[in-house]
């Protein structure tokens, strides 16, 4: 993982104990995951947790170098996708 992704992952683990798992580097046709600049924060069916995490990340874009998040769109209903610089 990139330094920003690693820092965000650690923050999420420490702040949100309800998170089921966090995916990072994996093969994909887009470069974000293979390059280690994306996380998938798995929240299962807890939409409130996903809302809280997404809002928190959006409020700290500078801290983690957030480029964008995906939540409640395009099959992102059981996890929050975050791409960082």
Q: How does the language model describe each region?
A:
Residues 1-80, 84:
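Secreted/periplasmic proteins that engage bacterial cell-wall peptidoglycan
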């Amino acid at each position: 993982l990139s330094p920003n992704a690693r820092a965000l992952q650690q923050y999420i683990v420490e702040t949100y104990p309800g998170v089921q798992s966090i995916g990072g580097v994996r093969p994909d046709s887009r470069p974000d995951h293979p390059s280690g600049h994306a996380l998938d924060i798995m929240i299962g069916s807890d939409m409130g947790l996903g809302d809280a995490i997404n809002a928190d990340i959006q409020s700290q874009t500078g801290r983690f170098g957030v480029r964008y998040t995906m939540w409640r769109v395009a099959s992102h209903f059981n996890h929050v996708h975050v791409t960082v610089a």
